[in-house]
């Protein structure tokens, strides 16, 4: 059962940042498993039943959800072989990560965040979302208001088209959503110490449940664009 992240979860990731080489990692592999991998796996497993309720096709196997500790350095100036943080994603099984719709959680010595959104820029899906907003702005606004984002300290984030023309029928409250180039909703400045309590599972789960109507809306749009035969 997940009891919160450990002090050594953070200490190991700090040590790895300053000794980012295969010798250190291999010598401390058991410590990595015990202090980092196991707590992440336990948290994923506790969230999994709720994620299946949100979308029965959601991938919830921990080894499929968690980020790799090894970095892909092929196209990066930073050649450090290991990450100094971890994240996990819940998305539909078998879907490519790029442009996918997903829930996420991220934790490390200098970060704590979670939310839901689209990985990278998905112009096709966002254009379809804009089309739906133009057709029925009040319905979209009503759904977003029902989520009560501010009560959950959740905020829309991601880059926007600064020069995109917004039709008159789009209300002010939807303009941020309408002009989105990238779109995700994230927890606003969660208290870092929350990660060390078992209660974080409930906090994250409650936010994921709150975001379910938006996830299902966008999921439905994605399925309309690319129906499966």
Name what the model sees in each region.
Residues 17-52, 206-228:
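Contiguous, amphipathic alpha-helical segments that mediate oligomerization or scaffolding
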Residues 1-23, 195-198, 221-228:
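Short, charged, low-complexity amphipathic alpha-helix
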Residues 33-78:
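Gly/Pro-rich turn-and-neighbor structural signature
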Residues 109-169:
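Compact, glycine/acidic-enriched structural inserts
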Residues 74-134:
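Aromatic- and glycine-enriched beta-alpha-beta binding-site module
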Residues 172-229:
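Charge-rich, low-complexity terminal tails
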Residues 69, 87, 162-175:
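Aromatic/basic-lined ligand-recognition segments
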Residues 29-36, 118, 129-133, 196-200:
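Short histidine-centered catalytic/ligand-binding loop motif
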């Amino acid at each position: 059962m997940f009891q919160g992240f450990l002090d050594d979860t953070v200490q190991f990731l700090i040590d790895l940042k300053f000794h980012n080489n295969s010798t250190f990692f291999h010598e401390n592999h058991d410590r990595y498993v015990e202090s980092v991998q196991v707590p992440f796996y336990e948290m994923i497993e506790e969230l999994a039943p709720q994620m299946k309720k949100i979308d029965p096709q959601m991938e919830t196997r921990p080894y499929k959800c968690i980020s790799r500790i090894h970095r892909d350095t092929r196209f990066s100036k930073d050649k450090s072989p290991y990450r100094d943080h971890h994240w996990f994603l819940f998305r539909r099984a078998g879907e490519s990560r790029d442009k996918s719709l997903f829930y996420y959680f991220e934790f490390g010595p200098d970060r704590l965040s979670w939310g839901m959104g689209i990985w990278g820029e998905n112009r096709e899906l966002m254009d379809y979302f804009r089309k739906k907003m133009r057709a029925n702005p009040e319905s979209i606004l009503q759904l977003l208001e029902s989520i009560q984002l501010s009560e959950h300290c959740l905020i829309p984030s991601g880059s926007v088209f600064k020069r995109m023309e917004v039709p008159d029928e789009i209300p002010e409250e939807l303009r941020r959503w309408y002009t989105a180039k990238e779109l995700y909703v994230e927890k606003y400045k969660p208290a870092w110490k929350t990660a060390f309590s078992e209660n974080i599972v409930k906090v994250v789960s409650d936010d994921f449940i709150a975001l379910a109507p938006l996830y299902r809306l966008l999921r439905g749009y994605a399925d309309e664009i690319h129906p499966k035969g």
